[in-house]
């Protein structure tokens, strides 16, 4: 994508099908599916590629933000519902494309997907796609940073628990002189004195 943008491209799409081999028949020892006993790597598509497509869209959208503002990204790869489309948009896609989903469910599925996307938008009170495009990008970081944040949280929890335990074990201040008796606190002070 970077090379395409450097070359003057105004937009890219991600991802197409992933070249794949479905299997090898262990009886015939031939790859499958076969045509006249032979095969060729084909395109792996549908919802199985969605996690890969989402990662690629996130990475490209992040690059566009920092290096090529104003360029566009169309997300595709496993979109079968409006919720799927929303995920691509949240990760920075400007538009989405559907192929395998329509092949599986028919052209009428496009209206369903649009209705589902609109329901998502209404739920979150988004009026336009721009209101949420790329909104999830700010929540990505490095593995190192995740470990640091988790360690920091655990250290704070441990310190708070130790402070609470120390407060629970600390001796209660006893009344040492008549002048320390309080009218409002007399019952509590008496109980504390009796318990030792």
Predicted regions and their residues:
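Short, surface-exposed acidic/glycine-rich loop or hinge patches that mediate macromolecular interfaces
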Residues: 78-79, 103
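Alpha/beta enzyme core
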Residues: 1-74, 80-95, 142-172, 179-186
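C-terminal helical cap(s) of enzyme catalytic domains, especially alpha/beta-barrels
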Residues: 21-41, 103-126
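Short beta->alpha connector loops at strand-helix junctions that form conserved
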Residues: 99-100
């Amino acid at each position: 994508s970077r090379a395409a943008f450097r070359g003057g491209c105004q937009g890219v799409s991600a991802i197409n099908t992933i070249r794949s081999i479905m299997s090898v028949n262990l009886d015939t020892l031939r790859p499958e599916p076969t045509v006249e006993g032979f095969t060729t790597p084909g395109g792996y598509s549908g919802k199985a590629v969605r996690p890969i497509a989402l990662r690629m869209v996130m990475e490209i959208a992040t690059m566009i933000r920092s290096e090529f503002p104003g360029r566009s990204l169309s997300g595709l790869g496993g979109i079968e519902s409006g919720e799927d489309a929303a995920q691509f948009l949240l990760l920075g896609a400007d538009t989405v494309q559907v192929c395998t989903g329509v092949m599986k469910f028919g052209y009428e599925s496009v209206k369903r997907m649009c209705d589902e996307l609109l329901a998502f938008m209404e739920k979150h009170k988004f009026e336009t796609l721009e209101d949420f495009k790329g909104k999830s990008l700010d929540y990505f970081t490095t593995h190192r940073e995740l470990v640091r944040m988790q360690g920091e949280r655990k250290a704070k929890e441990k310190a708070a628990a130790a402070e609470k335990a120390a407060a629970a074990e600390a001796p209660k201040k006893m009344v040492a002189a008549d002048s320390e008796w309080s009218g409002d606190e007399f019952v509590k002070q008496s109980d504390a004195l009796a318990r030792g």
